[in-house]
């Protein structure tokens, strides 16, 4: 399933009844968030606000408001098919040579997909149909949403920030929120470990005092947007991965004012620079934790050019206590993570990041346990294998007879198979999400691993309990006569 641009995807969603056009005048200040939040919690459609109060530019919200829409954006029909995306990423992360002639042909589809990885550079692009520069640059023309009553200012949320380190061949795409503080200025809130911040740090070391080029694309095609939030290998660019998802090369164009390349079909592109040493206090903002975060200084992004499509659409979202759009993305991307982890740890049966745990702060892993201490190895592996789990505070490891996605099962395993002193692992002074105000130091805190597996010799000296199992023959006999018994008329035979 191929979408050339965001508008193709909008058209498909509308055909499927997955997009609602809102013709009434709605204020980007708080009102859009209220409508989007109610719609998302009800599993409703994407929303296109055609008449934002005080603006002529429509606003697109809740684009990825259900896991199935995330899957559609990745070119798949349902969430389960995202396991195939994960298998492709696992293959790209650690490709293996064919083990024989048959294996060569089995892997041929994966190798053919690699042909779509290089970008296609255009000279003329839709995203540059209109160009604003100098005094004409005015961010207040864009209907940037203010999401929560205590937010400091309107906030750009879905911008794909494009950077390149001075010694890197490939660009980095990252999504960092940006507070509007003037007609041509935003605050770039990127954390120190993120790709954009690392590129900036390297730039400042090699080009002290020089301006760092930055571009931000808004309203790219869904494959490019989702490529920026997917755990692609460090050696693979987000544009290359988007080409794999789309099945066609990602079309890019050189920016008007710098050498960065942006998605050619993007609705809006902000071009400019960060002046080393220029910072401003960012926040507070309501975020995905359900709280307002503290104020801190971040670099100022000065916009020198705005390029856009004719009749541009502004793509936006809000973040708050789950469920929100990032939590929905987390549910879908969970399926991508599983094959990647299984490639490194074949003993993993399932891996689950509950959305109520902010989609990354708590993980439940089920394994085919093979030896004493196995659960602890898996805990350490989860924390260290992918940088996406650097901020996962709690890892619960269970046996494969437990459903990782059923809290009844998980709580049963914790309360019957764990001794708190023996089976709890605490690791101090580890990287923690900057937004986690529960940590004693900003960005540094502890992690907890919980071994809720059955204990093997060497882990306990006691006789271990045997789970109760029903007799299958008895269950089958009662199933056959259950309806005749008429005990619970609405309850079918199991």
Swiss-Prot record:
GO molecular function (one): 3-octaprenyl-4-hydroxybenzoate carboxy-lyase activity
GO BP annotation list: ubiquinone biosynthetic process
SUPFAM superfamilies from the UniProt entry: FMN-binding split barrel, UbiD C-terminal domain-like
Binding-site list for Mn(2+): 172, 238
GO cellular component terms given for this protein: cytosol; plasma membrane
Note accompanying the cofactor annotation: Binds 1 prenylated FMN per subunit.
UniProt keyword annotations, A-Z: Cell membrane, Decarboxylase, Flavoprotein, FMN, Lyase, Manganese, Membrane, Metal-binding, Ubiquinone biosynthesis
Pfam families associated with the record: UbiD (PF01977), UbiD_C (PF20696), UbiD_N (PF20695)
Membrane topology classification: Peripheral membrane protein
UniProt entry tagged with the keyword Lipid metabolism: no
PANTHER family recorded: 3-OCTAPRENYL-4-HYDROXYBENZOATE CARBOXY-LYASE-RELATED, FERULIC ACID DECARBOXYLASE 1
Protein name from the UniProt record: 3-octaprenyl-4-hydroxybenzoate carboxy-lyase
Species assigned in the record: Erwinia tasmaniensis (strain DSM 17950 / CFBP 7177 / CIP 109463 / NCPPB 4357 / Et1/99)
